[in-house]
């Protein structure tokens, strides 16, 4: 039996919540029983491999798709019934930006977009355009992938929405552009206090922003927790073990990932550090150190975990 990982954040106030959400395409379920909880003011990173259901989840939150079961709430509203109101308070960066207006200049696109958002802040939009080094006179259809991504981010941020929903926001950005863009996003979050939901499969790129982690695999949300809980409870233990060592029976269900060479083991284990160390020692292992995993390593460990 495997360790039960936390999936209920029990936050007093949630910007995003789903309960038992299911979505089916034909006979195949893209989502099954998803209970997503994003606290107000959090920067929540939802990770998973391609095809895990991340983009489908975001489209449900925006009312672009309807669930086949369960309940969705975004800032207390039902996107199916109040879709326009929800979208007016969300800044959305899609995974694939299909402009539909490729002939428009970036400046004209901003004017077009601003019409739909009463809270649009032109002064802030200009500041972002300058910070992102955007030439607003260029047609958006002729922009590089990285610059097009920055235009999407500007469109999402310029009306200072209470919720940003970003699907692979760093896709197409070179290392320098990525660092600058994430810096601008961090400043935006600090200034506005908005909630951010980021979907990605490249965790290290958004590591410095994240304070919550959700793990999605095969259409299910298998774990979600604050980052401090993750760092406290999931650690990598290095230990020397005697010849013929049979393992630590008391830890059978809590080992998230196993590794090591020869008589040295390197295990990612979920549990209280003192208790895990005690059980390893009682089994004959000599624990050399225990350290928290990076966010990316934790995500990989949780994604590779298999229920038994």
Where are the predicted features?
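Short, surface-exposed acidic/glycine-rich loop or hinge patches that mediate macromolecular interfaces
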Residues: 77-80, 242, 270, 293
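Structural motif detector for alpha-helix initiation sites
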Residues: 40, 106, 227, 292-295
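Short, surface-exposed beta-strand/loop "edge" segments at domain boundaries and coil↔beta transitions
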Residues: 164-168, 244-246, 274-277
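C-terminal coupling/interaction segments
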Residues: 2-7, 264, 268-308
């Amino acid at each position: 039996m495997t360790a039960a990982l936390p999936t209920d954040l029990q936050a007093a106030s949630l910007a995003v919540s789903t309960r038992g959400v299911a979505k089916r395409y034909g006979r195949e379920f893209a989502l099954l029983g998803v209970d997503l909880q994003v606290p107000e003011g959090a920067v929540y990173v939802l990770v998973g491999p391609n095809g895990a259901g991340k983009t489908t989840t975001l489209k449900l939150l925006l009312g672009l798709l309807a669930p086949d079961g369960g309940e969705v709430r975004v800032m207390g509203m039902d996107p199916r019934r109040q879709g326009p109101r929800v979208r007016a308070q969300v800044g959305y960066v899609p995974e694939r930006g299909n402009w539909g207006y490729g002939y428009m200049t970036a400046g004209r696109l901003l004017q077009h977009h601003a019409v739909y958002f009463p809270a649009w802040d032109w002064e802030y939009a200009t500041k972002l355009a300058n910070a992102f080094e955007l030439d607003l006179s260029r047609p958006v259809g002729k922009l590089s992938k990285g610059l097009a991504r920055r235009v999407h981010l500007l469109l999402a941020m310029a009306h200072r929405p209470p919720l940003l929903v970003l699907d692979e926001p760093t896709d197409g950005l070179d290392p320098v552009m990525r660092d600058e863009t994430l810096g601008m996003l961090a400043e935006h979050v600090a200034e506005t206090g908005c909630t951010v939901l980021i979907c990605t499969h490249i965790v290290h790129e958004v590591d410095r922003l994240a304070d919550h982690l959700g793990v999605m695999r095969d259409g299910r949300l298998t774990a979600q927790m604050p980052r401090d809980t993750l760092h406290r409870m999931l650690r990598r233990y290095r230990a020397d073990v005697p010849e013929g060592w049979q393992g630590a029976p008391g830890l059978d269900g809590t080992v998230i990932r196993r590794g090591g060479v020869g008589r040295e083991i390197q295990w990612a284990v979920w549990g209280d550090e003192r208790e895990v160390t005690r059980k390893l020692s009682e089994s004959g292992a000599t624990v050399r150190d225990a350290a928290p995993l990076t966010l990316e390593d934790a995500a990989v460990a949780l994604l590779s975990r298999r229920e038994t």
